[in-house]
Amino acid sequence: MKQDKTFSAILKNNLQSSFTHAITYVVAILFELFISINFYIRKGFFLGNGTSDLLLFFSAVPYISIIIVPSICYKFESSLYDNFVPLKSFKIVFSHYLSNLIVFSIFIIFLIPCALFINFFGSIDIGQLFIGIFFLFLYGSCIISICSFFNEIFTSPIVSFIVSALVLAIFNCAHLFVVYFSFSNIISNFIKYISFAWHFDAASKGIFDTRDFIYFIATSFIFLFLSVIVVELKKGRIFSKKQKTSIILIFGISILILLNGNSYYKRFDFSKNKTFSISKYTKKLSENITDSFKITYYRSSSLSRLYPQIRDIQDFLQIYSSLNKNISFLIKDPDKDSSLSQVLENYGITSQQMRTIDNNSTQYLNVYSSIILEYQGNFTAIPFTMDVETLEYDLDIKLSQMIFNKNLVVNILCGNGMNFYEDYNYVIPWLNSQGFICNLLDLQNSNFINNLNKSSGTLLIFGDSEINIENAIAIENYILSDKGNAFLCLNPYSVKIDTDWSITQNQKTNLIEMVENWGIHFEEKIIADPSCAKITLYSQEESDNPFSQNSTYTKVLNYPLWASLMPQEYAKSGVTTFWAVPISINDDSSSLVKPILITSSQSYNYDIDKNNPSSLIQTNPFELAKINTSNKQKSTQIVGVELSGKLEGLYNYGSTSSAKIFIISDQYFVNSLMTGYIGGDFGDYRNFDFMIDELLYLSENEDLMSIHSKNNFDKTLYKITDEYTFVKYEIITLVSLIFIFPILIICLGVSLWIRKKIKLTHI
């Protein structure tokens, strides 16, 4: 009982020393400012490059901790009297460790509101946030125990601070050594295993991995145990042979637990969309495997040493293979067996190059991360994968095709005079990567109509300005003959996207007239929305001084004619549209017409000016910024619709009762040039995800669509509605994090210091 009271008194004294010492508040402010500035300013959060992915947020914590944690663990004057305290060495060490961990935990808690500010602009994954925070506590426990160990070894606080910081720097950056230096596999695996960043990778994605949990707990215990031994030795204690045996045994068991944490493990997926978990559809699909299904993962060891997410792929494949006794899983390393490279080449798989730097020289390694699937004598491949975000979909679609011998076919046509090799050059590779077989239809081919009649499957059309009446008749006949559903991207206007963005009226609108016959109408307006994409403009000012460099200026403008649609039922991540036209629905339509894409409630229109046929509306971003839109009527508007049920022909006498057609009023939404404009540093491919989801839906593969769309968690800043609101929340965020939070920390420190002084005056 007396020992417990003494322990509580020491713990309380340590906490009082920490919370009344200026260094604690200095490092607290430094910690919070570094994380905030790194994420919100250095990463360009407010400059069009922002993302709500907390992976970037957490990544800065280990680096600032190199200085912060040794500062927290710095020995104050009161620690000099520890040897005179009637308390066991373990409790003395543990009291210092626990008080430091409490201080660090408070620092970590300060990060929660810092992360929640992201919700002003986009959606954060709460599971990712709290699993990340929990593992930061474990990480703090681990590095504090290391600092405690060096505090006991070195008498000088300055020396222990420097050594602790150096050791933490090594542990935090260990995984980078294998990037810049060449090591054997054993040494590389060891370096990877001791890396803190490597063990935090899963947690930063919202996964509770018992291997990482055991690593942090076991490492904390080992260094605390060593600290106690050091304290006992410094007191002059001589251990008996039995005690030495016990110490060696405890230390050995701890090391074995640490090293064997990888043997038996569990992973719990707390991410919002359960990206790293097997879905019900996959479990049901696996029940159809009646023969041997082999999964062979060709993974270069040089690649797995460098990227922790490669471990996720192996784990997911192991879970996948456990679904059915007929599934077998094997890993092969092309780095160890050079003949495997030839095997992969026979499958049409080539290596990917990876750059490494060794002894001031740059080398390029050929690496593989490929999956070969074999079922009933048939083979298919996933050529290269680096994460599990789309792995379940990739496996399911290939397994489904092998079991049911049914391919996904999409017939694609550029009806606006553009082509798939320059203007839509991402479309075919993207479709192929998602398991679709593309059948290109060419209007310039004299056999276009015959080729269309021979085809079957979903029809994907971009624009109709070059589609003549004969071609329109053939397309309508294709739809009415139930050969396949259709995804029509139509707009009665064309834009000179590669020059001045001027808008002109199309001379041919045969498909427009066809779909208007089915109960929808394209209005003579262009949609504008304050919730829109941003354009980054660059200008260079030449200097008069020949010895100075020219100045480059960057300006980011909201461009309301590129409406950014928020996530909705048919677009899980949202969509960016380019010069879209509002669609209205006729009440007397015989088919079922349902809106699938709508704008924000603040969207408005620019009316078409037919008196200026060369430029029907103003499209210059600088001129648009000057226009006062306060008097324009604001409302949600329809950009896309689904037609289903009965359809009757405009050009043909035929009809169908089971149509399923998607129509959006934007022919450029997957155009290569437009994708480049909105891509930013991280790439914005939401439009392509939307395209794949709808093609899967139209191909009667709604289960696969649900697998594909579950990974489409929108990490963009889609909640922004207008520039004024964006700037307002930007100011609130920066003022709160850079000024208000530090001031609150200072006020807390001053109040505790005053309280201590008052207390001392009454003694």
Question: Where are the predicted features?
Answer:
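Terminal transmembrane helical anchor/hairpin motif
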Residues: 4, 42-46, 51, 160-235, ...
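Acidic, S/T/G-rich, low-cysteine, solvent-exposed domains in lumenal/extracellular/periplasmic regions
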Residues: 404, 420-703
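Aromatic- and glycine-rich beta-strand/loop motifs that create alpha-glucan
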Residues: 1-25
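Extracellular ligand-binding/catalytic regions of CAZymes and related secreted enzymes
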Residues: 197, 237-294, 401-407, 521, ...
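Helix-loop-helix units of permease transmembrane domains in multi-pass membrane transporters
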Residues: 75-101, 480-483
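Long, hydrophobic alpha-helical segments
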Residues: 56-79, 107
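Secretory targeting signals
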Residues: 36-40, 94-158
